[in-house]
Amino acid sequence: MNIPDNLRYTKDHEWIKLLEDGLTALVGITDFAQSELGDIVFVETKPVGTKVAAHGTFGTVEAVKTVADLFAPAAGEIVEVNAGLDDAAIVNSDPYNEGWIVKMKLDNPADVEALLSPADYSALIGE
C-alpha cells in the first residue's frame, strides 16, 4: 500500500497536503480507500466557495459497488475542484497526485499537524 511521507491522514482514509503558501491544501482519498472502494465511476463535491467544518462532508465518491462520503481533514473553504475528475478513474490510478479531489483554503493550517502521521496511518490500516 502506498502511503507517502509528505502527507497527513485521517481515520476516514482522506489525505491532506499543505501547499507551499502554508494556507491552502490538496485533499484526496488514500490508496487504501480507493482499493477498498473498487472502480470509482463518479466523484461529486460541494461547489467552490463552500465552507466545510473539520470532519464535515465535502462530497461523495461513487464506485461500482458503493457510495462513500468524503470528509474534510480540516476546516476551510473549497477554492478549487480538480477538473481532471471528469475521468473519475484517475482517483484509482493516481490517488495522491492527479487524483486529488479538492483544494481548500484552511481556517487554521496548524490543524494539519494534529492529523495522523504516515506511520500512524500505516498502523491504522494494518500495514
From Swiss-Prot:
<dbReference type="InterPro" id="IPR017453">
    <property type="entry name" value="GCV_H_sub"/>
</dbReference>
<dbReference type="InterPro" id="IPR000089">
    <property type="entry name" value="Biotin_lipoyl"/>
</dbReference>
<protein>
    <recommendedName>
        <fullName>Glycine cleavage system H protein</fullName>
    </recommendedName>
</protein>
<comment type="similarity">
    <text>Belongs to the GcvH family.</text>
</comment>
<dbReference type="InterPro" id="IPR002930">
    <property type="entry name" value="GCV_H"/>
</dbReference>
<dbReference type="Pfam" id="PF01597">
    <property type="entry name" value="GCV_H"/>
</dbReference>
<dbReference type="GO" id="GO:0019464">
    <property type="term" value="P:glycine decarboxylation via glycine cleavage system"/>
</dbReference>
<feature type="domain" description="Lipoyl-binding">
    <location>
        <begin position="24"/>
        <end position="105"/>
    </location>
</feature>
<dbReference type="InterPro" id="IPR011053">
    <property type="entry name" value="Single_hybrid_motif"/>
</dbReference>
<dbReference type="GO" id="GO:0005960">
    <property type="term" value="C:glycine cleavage complex"/>
</dbReference>
<keyword id="KW-0450">Lipoyl</keyword>
<feature type="modified residue" description="N6-lipoyllysine">
    <location>
        <position position="65"/>
    </location>
</feature>
<dbReference type="InterPro" id="IPR033753">
    <property type="entry name" value="GCV_H/Fam206"/>
</dbReference>
<dbReference type="GO" id="GO:0005737">
    <property type="term" value="C:cytoplasm"/>
</dbReference>
<comment type="function">
    <text>The glycine cleavage system catalyzes the degradation of glycine. The H protein shuttles the methylamine group of glycine from the P protein to the T protein.</text>
</comment>
<dbReference type="InterPro" id="IPR003016">
    <property type="entry name" value="2-oxoA_DH_lipoyl-BS"/>
</dbReference>
<comment type="subunit">
    <text>The glycine cleavage system is composed of four proteins: P, T, L and H.</text>
</comment>
